[in-house]
Regions:
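Short N-terminal "domain-start" leader segments
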Residues: 1-22
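C-terminal secondary-structure termini that scaffold catalytic or DNA-interacting sites
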Residues: 3, 234, 245-267, 274-276, ...
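N-terminal DNA-binding module of tyrosine recombinases/phage integrases
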Residues: 18-118, 285-300, 394
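C-terminal catalytic core of Y-nucleophile DNA break-rejoin enzymes
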Residues: 38, 44, 236-238, 247-248, ...
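N-terminal core-binding DNA-recognition domain of tyrosine site-specific recombinases/integrases
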Residues: 39-45, 69, 81-162, 200-203, ...
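Basic, Lys/Arg- and aromatic-enriched nucleic-acid-binding interface segment
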Residues: 135, 139-143, 154, 158, ...
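Short, basic (Lys/Arg/His-rich) helix/loop patches that form interaction surfaces
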Residues: 194-205, 270, 286-295, 300-312, ...
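Catalytic-site neighborhood detector that most strongly recognizes the C-terminal catalytic loop/helix
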Residues: 243-245, 358, 377-403
Length: 411
């Protein structure tokens, strides 16, 4: 016959409860879903039973807080990515790159069950203030973390999604226009290109940046261009594929691949301006003398752009080059400004995608037909075109008003 277990004060203990004689603390033992023995402790019996009640509630909800406590954000994100079987390889590559760069080695190591709303808010503010992330980049980080936590909610690992409402708070407190890439001004654009053209180290980048600023191509579309995509007679460029760079295998080493456009709008023919034609002809003459690019990627060859190692450049290397060029330009500008006793005119930080946005802005300043702009840019959604057009025309309107105010005296 089973004996009734009692505490040191003679009170009857329930199954799994005990009181240790060494420190008089109460304990409750149970077996988790993985068959492991677990314990919870309290200094008094009332508190212990409150913890037991909470544990029972969690178990009835299909949630064991102790098992959940072992799962990190990294674990849940990797699980989330493994379930996203319909992702394009380009998108998957971008997701993994963003996560590994900004989340995995810091916030990703935290136990997901211990993260609260304030933790997420603090992390986002850290990325903005300490890491210098732009608002649109933070949006990309949020795009990864929110569905990761949502999966944890659906799997009943956590009760609520701690990322809910965080971006709204960030926008409210910082008053930033998130997700908007601003174009370079015409003086900034000219300063950037003139610096490259006249620089002994960076001048080899001039053709690529000329093509980017003169076509509005996405960086992957530009790097993937082949000589067969050019029609000098019709002065057109065929955009029908893109170059992507993503990690593969357990080593996570990144390799170049060819990707088809995400939408039908991405397949398009765009005009070849004179300066862009000059850039292509310059590269054609160089390869004619030094040897044609013989790199083959997924069955495609004859690529226009080639680095000093004989390989096709990857998008990340282009963005790194932009950062080096900007740093060099701004450092030189500060020296010159000091010599001339004037304020330095520095170039802002930007990426290759800003050059696409810059081209679109210049196009919007000259062209009023939104469907033409949408076709050239390959925008799936006309709203994207309209947003850029509205921003560009608003700036032009302000310039017109300023000129009018300077010449027209009606008072």
């Amino acid at each position: 016959m089973a004996t009734t277990r009692k505490d040191l004060r003679g009170r009857t203990l329930r199954k799994g409860e005990m009181q240790r004689s060494s420190d008089k603390r109460y304990a409750y033992s149970y077996t988790d879903p993985l068959g492991r023995r677990k314990y919870i402790y309290a200094n008094d019996l009332v508190t212990l039973r409150e913890k037991e009640a909470q544990l029972t509630k969690d178990q009835m909800d299909g949630l064991d807080i102790y098992v959940a406590g072992k799962a990190t954000v990294n674990f849940v994100f990797d699980r989330y990515m493994s379930l996203k079987t319909n992702l394009r390889q380009t998108t998957r590559s971008n997701y993994l790159y963003m996560y590994d760069r900004f989340i995995r080695d810091t916030f990703g190591k935290k136990k997901i069950a211990e993260i609260r709303y304030s933790d997420v808010l603090q992390f986002y503010n850290y990325l903005l203030d300490k890491q210098g992330l732009q608002a649109n980049t933070l949006e990309s980080v949020h795009t990864l973390l929110h569905p990761t936590f949502q999966l944890a909610v659906r799997d009943e690992i956590v009760r609520k999604n701690p990322t809910d409402g965080v971006m709204a708070e960030i926008k409210k407190s910082s008053e930033q226009t998130t997700g908007v890439r601003h174009a370079l001004t015409i003086p900034q654009q000219r300063a950037f290109m003139e610096h490259i053209a006249n620089h002994l180290v960076y001048c080899h980048w001039w053709p690529l940046f000329t093509v980017l600023l003169g076509t509005g191509c996405r960086i992957g579309e530009a790097l993937g261009l082949r000589w067969d995509d050019l029609d000098y007679e019709r002065r057109t460029i065929s955009i029908n594929h893109s170059l992507v760079y993503y990690p593969v295998g357990e080593s996570r080493n990144s390799v170049l691949h060819i990707s088809k456009p995400k939408t039908e709008a991405g397949v398009r023919t765009i005009p070849m301006f004179d300066t862009v034609k000059d850039a292509f002809e310059m590269l054609h003459e160089e390869q004619k003398e030094s040897g044609w690019n013989d790199v083959e990627i997924d069955g495609m060859s004859g690529f226009i752009f080639c680095n000093r190692f004989g390989n096709v450049p990857n998008p990340q290397s282009v963005n790194r080059a932009i950062k080096r060029i900007l740093a060099d330009y701004n450092a030189g500008e500060e020296v010159e400004a000091k010599k001339q006793h004037r304020e330095a005119v520095l170039l802002p930080d930007f990426s290759a995608h800003h050059l696409r946005h810059t081209f679109c802005t210049r196009l919007c300043e000259k062209e009023t037909n939104l469907k033409v702009i949408q076709s050239v840019m390959g925008h799936k959604d006309i709203q994207t075109t309209m947003d850029i057009y509205a921003e560009a025309t608003e700036e032009k309107k302000q310039e017109s008003f300023e000129r009018l105010a300077a010449t027209l005296d009606i008072f």
